């Protein structure tokens, strides 16, 4: 019966290339007891131009990495253009380590035409033909990975969907969770677990002793919450490949939380511990945060220091050390408090957008990143205020249960 349930959830048997990763083949030879996995969200290419952006940035970078054991793509490989799915999967299959994928809400066939949305919702026909599986599970290095489709379309329209599992999926998940006792179980979906309908019924399936990590994409912002615990990895397309292009011709595409386009690296230990780092695409691995001098609203002559930790958690702790000013004056360390402010990077984009004329926007539409002011989950500010010249740089120390950062960074 359990075998029938498992087969009912897959289109075909998982391809041998991808299954080899579950058995330990491919990728680098594991160093010690650490399994290194890239968690990649939303390349979401819409046409050949955007496919070129992805090839020359995130896919090229992933291809060049030799420190990875495995990669999991968390959905939205394409943006409703299913003709690009075969090329996307070919590129992913060319990476020098096993890769796995979950489908996103844009990785589905769209049936257009008169009344088509009323009679036939999106489905995974092309995904099943090209990828070959939907839900799958495997254990590697004492970590159990469960990859599941949690995008549920209703029959009322092609764009109407919610996050959640069917009852059949829950039965399958229950059977998987009760086999063996790995140190950690990673549930990978497209829509964040915290946004799923019926998540309490899913939590009820998890054995009390099972340690979980929920990872996802979908939102185009980065967020970490230890109360679940949940990791929303952001989007490698950023804000849908929009923005001014860099020297390589790749759009800036800042995410709405203020994090650059990027992905997470997770180092899983055999005892269930894991370490995380955020990797900005096309930037040095050490570049994991930014620092800003933000004028006080009531006194423009004074300012507070603001830190954006691109992959930071809501329980993170930030300290900023300001360099000494003048001979005999020692630098001082300041504890920061988490803020619900809009990221300074987003504020900068909003100011840039406001400076554009209507005619310029019309002729340079793709340079316009449609960002609005909204709280970012990984912004910290000093409780102390400062006056006088802004420091050229600060030293930032960040830590949470799974991430440690020490970085000297220029103040913007």
Predicted regions and their residues:
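Short acidic, glycine-rich surface-loop motifs adjacent to enzyme active sites
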Residues: 74, 176-195
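N-terminal active-site segment of His-dependent metallophosphoesterases
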Residues: 17-87, 388-393, 412
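Active-site glycine-centered loops adjacent to acidic/histidine catalytic or metal-binding residues
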Residues: 42, 75-76, 104-105, 190, ...
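Extended active-site neighborhood of metal-dependent phosphoesterases/phosphodiesterases
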Residues: 82-181, 198-215, 219-269, 274-277
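Aromatic sugar-binding surface patches on proteins
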Residues: 344-383
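Extended low-complexity, serine/threonine- and proline-enriched intrinsically disordered segments
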Residues: 316-356
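Binuclear metal-dependent phosphoesterase catalytic core
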Residues: 228-324, 379-401, 405-408
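Sec-dependent signal peptide recognition
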Residues: 2-8
């Amino acid at each position: 019966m359990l075998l029938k349930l498992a087969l009912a959830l897959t289109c075909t048997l998982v391809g041998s290339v991808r299954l080899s990763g579950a058995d330990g083949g491919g990728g680098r030879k594991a160093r010690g007891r650490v399994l290194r996995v890239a968690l990649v969200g939303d390349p979401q290419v819409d046409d050949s131009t955007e496919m070129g952006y992805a090839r020359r940035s995130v896919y090229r970078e992933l291809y060049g990495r030799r420190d990875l054991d495995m990669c999991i793509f968390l959905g939205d490989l394409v943006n409703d253009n299913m003709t690009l799915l075969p090329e996307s999967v070919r590129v992913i299959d060319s990476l020098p380590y096993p890769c796995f994928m979950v489908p996103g809400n844009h990785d589905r066939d769209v049936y257009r035409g008169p009344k088509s949305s009323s009679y036939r919702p999106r489905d995974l026909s092309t995904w099943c033909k090209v990828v070959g599986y939907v839900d799958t599970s495997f254990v590697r290095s004492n970590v159990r990975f469960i990859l599941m489709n949690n995008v549920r379309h209703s029959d009322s329209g092609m764009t109407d969907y919610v996050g959640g599992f069917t009852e059949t999926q829950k039965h399958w998940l229950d059977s998987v969770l009760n086999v063996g006792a790995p140190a950690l179980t990673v549930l990978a979906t497209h829509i964040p677990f915290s946004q799923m309908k019926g998540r309490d019924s899913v939590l009820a399936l998890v054995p009390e002793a099972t340690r979980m990590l929920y990872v996802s994409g979908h939102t185009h912002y980065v967020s970490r919450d230890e109360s679940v615990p949940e990791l929303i990895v952001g989007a490698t397309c950023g804000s849908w490949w929009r923005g001014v292009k860099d020297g390589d011709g790749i759009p800036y595409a800042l995410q709405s939380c203020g994090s650059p386009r990027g992905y997470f690296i997770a180092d899983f230990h055999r005892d269930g511990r894991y370490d995380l780092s955020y990797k900005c695409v096309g930037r040095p691995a050490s570049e994991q945060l930014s620092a800003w001098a933000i004028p006080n609203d009531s006194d423009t002559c004074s300012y507070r220091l603001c830190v954006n930790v691109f992959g930071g958690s809501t329980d993170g702790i930030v300290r900023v050390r300001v360099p000494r000013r003048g001979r005999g004056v020692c630098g001082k360390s300041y504890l920061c408090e988490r803020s619900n402010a809009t990221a300074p990077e987003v504020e900068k984009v909003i100011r840039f957008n406001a400076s554009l004329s209507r005619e310029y926007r019309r002729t340079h539409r793709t340079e316009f990143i449609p960002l609005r002011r909204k709280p970012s989950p990984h912004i910290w500010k000093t409780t102390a205020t400062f006056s006088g010249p802004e420091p050229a740089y600060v030293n930032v120390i960040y830590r949470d249960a799974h991430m440690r950062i020490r970085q000297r960074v220029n103040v913007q």
